[in-house]
Every structure is written in C-alpha cells, then in structure tokens.
C-alpha cells in the first residue's frame, strides 16, 4: 500500500481550510485517511504562526515508514525543520527542473 502525506480540503466555498493527512495514495482527496498530522489555513497572514501547524514527531514517523509527501506538503515540512529523506529531495529537484514556465495570457492571445 503506497502512503502519501497530502492536503485534504475542508472549509466553505471561497474559504478553504486544509488538513495535512496521511492517506492511501488511491483514496479520494477528501476521503478516508490514516492520520491527521497537521493543518494549513491559507486565509491567515503569511507571518501567522497558526497558518501551518504540523505534528513533527508523527511526520518523522510516517516518513520513516516510507510515506511520500506531495510537493506542497514537502515544502511545509522543510519549513518546519524536519529533514526529508534524500530520495524525496531528489524527486523534488527533478520535478522542479522538468517544470516549464506557463505561457502568459498575452502570449496565448497572440498565437
């Protein structure tokens, strides 16, 4: 069973709130999960300490068992001071290199 650490959306329309959860990779985005390991509230100010709240000890446990974080969650984990496994770091670097800049809307209209 492949396990991911990812965001599950909650909140109301135009007022998102996310739970950071550990879930089976095939489970629906907002569906069943194994454990809630944090929260993310994008509506709070960037400098607010409650914008991203993580249970570091549980995240370290799940990373140790082989759970893979999504890109966004991996950024949150690094900012919280938890070291990611080398394999995950390499995957993030490869994705960053392969990511292409999207053309601007002006370029789309001109073409």
UniProtKB/Swiss-Prot annotation:
<dbReference type="GO" id="GO:0003735">
    <property type="term" value="F:structural constituent of ribosome"/>
</dbReference>
<keyword id="KW-0687">Ribonucleoprotein</keyword>
<protein>
    <recommendedName>
        <fullName>Small ribosomal subunit protein bS16</fullName>
    </recommendedName>
</protein>
<dbReference type="InterPro" id="IPR000307">
    <property type="entry name" value="Ribosomal_bS16"/>
</dbReference>
<comment type="similarity">
    <text>Belongs to the bacterial ribosomal protein bS16 family.</text>
</comment>
<dbReference type="Pfam" id="PF00886">
    <property type="entry name" value="Ribosomal_S16"/>
</dbReference>
<dbReference type="GO" id="GO:0015935">
    <property type="term" value="C:small ribosomal subunit"/>
</dbReference>
<dbReference type="InterPro" id="IPR020592">
    <property type="entry name" value="Ribosomal_bS16_CS"/>
</dbReference>
<dbReference type="InterPro" id="IPR023803">
    <property type="entry name" value="Ribosomal_bS16_dom_sf"/>
</dbReference>
<dbReference type="GO" id="GO:0006412">
    <property type="term" value="P:translation"/>
</dbReference>
<keyword id="KW-0689">Ribosomal protein</keyword>
<dbReference type="GO" id="GO:0005737">
    <property type="term" value="C:cytoplasm"/>
</dbReference>
<feature type="region of interest" description="Disordered">
    <location>
        <begin position="92"/>
        <end position="111"/>
    </location>
</feature>
